[in-house]
Amino acid sequence: AIITGSLVMGNMQFADALRHAAFQVGSIITTTGYATINFDAWSQTCRTILVLLMFVGACAGSTGGGMKVSRFIVMVKTMTKELNSYIHPKSVKKIKMDGKPIEHEVVRSINVYLITFMIIFVASVFAISFEGHDLVTNFTAVAATINNIGPGLSMVGPDCNFGFFSNFSKLVIIFDMLAGRLELFPLLILFHPAVWKELFTQKI
């Protein structure tokens, strides 16, 4: 609704604004990767909303990328629970999803995933920043790849591509794409020495 209103205020017809806004929001939040218009030319408000939606991702259990909606819900509920515990120290409340309590181990694993995601994200943005491109390009390039979105903003917008990056930056982006598609930990496990040691031991 906000994007539609912003586009209408930018002299776009309501029907076209609603169609483009609905399609781009749906495409980004489901990590489809399509673009029917150069949304990089939209207002700062629209672009900010689209960037935020890049991190939400698809539903739990789907093949879409991103952090997944369920993880965000658990994260918000965890923050609310911690805030309430400061206000009411003696209260005992459990985090619930669909009316069922979530085990502490599940909450811990989600928190670890989100922390790992942010570490990889920040490290990737820092790694490709040495080429001297603007922050919007670097930030959305990593956001678009690690969340399997497709196009980003600025130099990696819908009308552009990632071909101008150096080979090193492309390797970083490739890693982010694999991490976003395969999930973080299955990919990181491949780099653990114990996995390779066990593999070579079995061959011998």
Predicted regions and their residues:
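Membrane-proximal intracellular helices of multi-pass ion channels
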Residues: 1-204
